[in-house]
């Protein structure tokens, strides 16, 4: 045969295949290691963000609790301070040794007006239903039921005023209610 005949490409040697596979495996390993490092960094960043957010939420909760505690403390303080003039009026009345019944009555009326005004400024309002008002179990407490000319289940008389604070009942009004005919 002659040397000029076309040669067929020969299959790569096993060493070359092995070297190519090793190079490819090394490239793939390097790529995966890089991806792993990137994912670990992202995971660490997210874990850090989570811990910071958790700490911030805890701090916000503590601040809110502190604010509520302060609001209660200073709300009560403000209410108590508004009652001091009423206490002063009672002290002044008791200091008078020679008061007439008329003077005592006038002083008690003035002190009651002062107390009522103070309560109203602090959103404490009286529940004092007029006779004939429909009985409301949310604001009234029936002490007795009596026969009356009025429609059934209406207030006949108020035995003791009730009180609400900002629409929440502190004490229901004690009332007598008309019986059904």
Curated annotation (Swiss-Prot):
It is found in: Cytoplasm. GO terms for molecular function: adenyl-nucleotide exchange factor activity; protein homodimerization activity; protein-folding chaperone binding; unfolded protein binding. One of its GO terms (cellular component) is cytosol. Signal peptide: none annotated. This is Protein GrpE. Keywords: Chaperone, Cytoplasm, Stress response. NCBIfam families: PRK14139.1, PRK14140.1. One of its GO terms (biological process) is protein folding. Homodimer. Participates actively in the response to hyperosmotic and heat shock by preventing the aggregation of stress-denatured proteins, in association with DnaK and GrpE. It is the nucleotide exchange factor for DnaK and may function as a thermosensor. Unfolded proteins bind initially to DnaJ; upon interaction with the DnaJ-bound protein, DnaK hydrolyzes its bound ATP, resulting in the formation of a stable complex. GrpE releases ADP from DnaK; ATP binding to DnaK triggers the release of the substrate protein, thus completing the reaction cycle. Belongs to the GrpE family. It comes from the Bacteria.
């Amino acid at each position: 045969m002659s040397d000029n005949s076309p040669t067929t490409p020969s299959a790569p040697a096993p060493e070359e295949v092995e070297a190519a596979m090793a190079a490819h495996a090394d490239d793939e390993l390097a790529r995966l290691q890089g991806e792993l490092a990137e994912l670990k960094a992202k995971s660490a960043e997210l874990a850090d963000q989570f811990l910071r957010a958790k700490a911030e939420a805890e701090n916000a909760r503590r601040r809110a609790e502190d604010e509520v505690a302060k609001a209660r403390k200073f709300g009560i303080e403000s209410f108590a301070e508004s009652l001091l003039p009423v206490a002063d009026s009672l002290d002044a009345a008791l200091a008078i040794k020679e008061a007439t019944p008329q003077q005592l009555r006038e002083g008690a009326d003035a002190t009651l007006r002062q107390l009522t005004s103070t309560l109203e400024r602090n959103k404490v309002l009286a529940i004092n239903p007029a006779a004939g008002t429909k009985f409301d179990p949310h604001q009234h407490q029936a002490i007795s039921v009596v026969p009356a000319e009025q429609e059934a289940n209406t207030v006949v008389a108020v035995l003791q005023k009730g009180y609400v604070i900002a629409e929440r009942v502190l004490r229901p009004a004690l009332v007598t209610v008309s019986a059904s005919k």
